[in-house]
């Protein structure tokens, strides 16, 4: 396990073994800067929301689940599959076969759009991630891609929904979450805290249904 995640993994293991009842479900969050909670800070420096999405999800879920952040700012689906440098979990296929997490929240597409990943490649890669997770018994929650003022993410959002339909996975339609552009943006492409929190709340509503006893 990479250094960044060892504490989360230890916490997950400890919590899963507590209480003598059913194990607390572990939920892993995969994604780019939208999951990490990145925003542009002073002089263009990258900083982070006061309460990043995965931390907010943990607050909302309480002791009903353990949330583990597996995101990497700027990461694409292909980066996750290949396990590029600094990826918290290495190659996805190897990690998903070994992790104790039962639910995978997969939220890619923002960085793919900005970096110009061909749509067909994005769809194949996302479908591969879902297939790998489902093949080892994981439940998958796919999260759509937020709108921007330029529309660059629109086709990627449609692909996420299409992959969810094709694989029968749960899907969070982030575009149904109330937003006022550009006021709810922290910078050109990242949600400010209030919008991020509303999106996370929508994700958590799905997770509550997926993880309830």
Segments and roles (model prediction):
Residues 14, 68, 141:
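Conserved Rossmann-like nucleotide-binding pocket used by diverse enzymes
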Residues 55, 86-213:
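Alpha-helical cap/lid subdomain in secreted, periplasmic
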Residues 38-49, 69-87, 114, 188:
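Acidic/histidine-rich helix-loop elements
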Residues 1-16:
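Sec-dependent bacterial lipoprotein signal peptides
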Residues 18-71, 94-98:
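Serine-esterase "nucleophile elbow" of acetyl-processing enzymes
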């Amino acid at each position: 396990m990479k250094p960044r995640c060892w504490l989360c993994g230890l916490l997950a293991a400890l919590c899963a073994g507590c209480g003598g009842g059913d194990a607390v479900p572990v939920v892993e969050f995969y994604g780019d800067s939208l999951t990490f909670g990145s925003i542009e800070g002073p002089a263009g420096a990258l900083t982070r929301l006061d309460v990043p999405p995965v931390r907010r999800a943990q607050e909302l879920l309480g002791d009903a689940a353990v949330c583990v952040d597996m995101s990497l700012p700027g990461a694409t689906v292909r980066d996750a599959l290949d396990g590029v440098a600094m990826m918290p979990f290495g190659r996805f296929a190897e990690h998903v076969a070994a992790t104790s997490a039962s639910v995978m929240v997969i939220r890619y597409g923002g960085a793919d759009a900005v970096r110009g990943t061909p749509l067909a490649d994005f769809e194949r890669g996302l479908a591969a991630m879902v297939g790998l997770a489902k093949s080892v018994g994981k439940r998958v929650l796919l999260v759509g891609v937020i709108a921007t003022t330029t529309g660059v993410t629109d086709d990627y959002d449609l692909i996420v929904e299409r992959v969810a339909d094709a694989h029968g996975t749960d899907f969070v339609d982030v575009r149904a979450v109330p937003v006022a552009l550009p006021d709810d943006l922290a910078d050109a492409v990242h949600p400010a805290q209030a919008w991020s929190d509303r999106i996370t709340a929508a994700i958590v509503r799905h997770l509550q249904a997926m993880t309830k006893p």
